[in-house]
A protein has these predicted regions:
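Conserved alpha-helix/loop element of class I SAM-dependent methyltransferases that forms part
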Residues: 60-77
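Conserved SAM-binding loop of SAM-dependent methyltransferases across substrates and taxa
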Residues: 88-100
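Conserved SAM-binding strand-loop segment of SAM-dependent methyltransferases
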Residues: 123-134
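A short acidic, Gly/Pro-enriched loop at the edge of an enzyme's catalytic core
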Residues: 134-145
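Conserved SAM/SAH-binding beta-strand->alpha-helix loop
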Residues: 110
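Conserved class I S-adenosyl-L-methionine
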Residues: 79-87
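Conserved SAM-binding loop
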Residues: 117-118
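N-terminal auxiliary segments of SAM/dcSAM-dependent transferases
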Residues: 1-38
């Protein structure tokens, strides 16, 4: 029954779909309090891809490898990066700590996810804001690279 209701909501219109996902991610962020869960993708493995990770990052090696693969398609060093759909912030944190951009901003529709990120991360070149991927609150050319992995 619940599944049927959700499917009806998702099929009504793009705005009802957006409303549902915003609510869903807020509920998830409020209730999934385990701050060890920083990434929500399935991960990536490729022979020869060997990242030297800090011990605390090893538990999420494969999801981090997906971010590494995607982000390294461009030279991110000293660039301003925007991650759209930053979720729990693990990808933006990885990029900020390992790939040496000038800055990383994570934007997510879930205010609860952004509040969680603000509590978890204290990295000088990393910040998070609430925002909508369909109406990004920055002027054109504010960022050098846009990354979207988990949405």
């Amino acid at each position: 029954m619940l599944k049927s209701i959700i499917l009806i909501i998702l099929k009504l219109s793009p705005s009802s779909k957006k409303w549902f996902w915003e609510k869903w991610y807020n509920v998830f962020a409020r209730n999934a309090k385990n701050t060890n869960l920083k990434l929500m993708n399935y991960g990536f493995h490729s022979p020869g891809l060997e990242l030297n990770l800090q011990e605390e990052d090893e538990i999420e090696r494969y999801p981090i490898q997906l971010y590494s693969f995607v982000a390294n398609q461009a030279d991110v060093k000293d660039k301003n990066i925007l991650e759209v759909g930053s979720g729990r912030g693990g990808g933006a944190s990885f990029i900020a700590r390992y790939l040496h951009p000038s800055s990383v901003t994570g934007i997510d529709i879930s205010k609860d996810a952004i509040e969680l990120c603000s509590k978890i991360y204290s990295i000088p070149n990393l910040d998070f804001i609430v925002g909508d991927s369909e109406n990004i609150p920055f002027a054109d050319n504010s960022y050098d690279i846009l990354i979207n992995v988990e949405s």
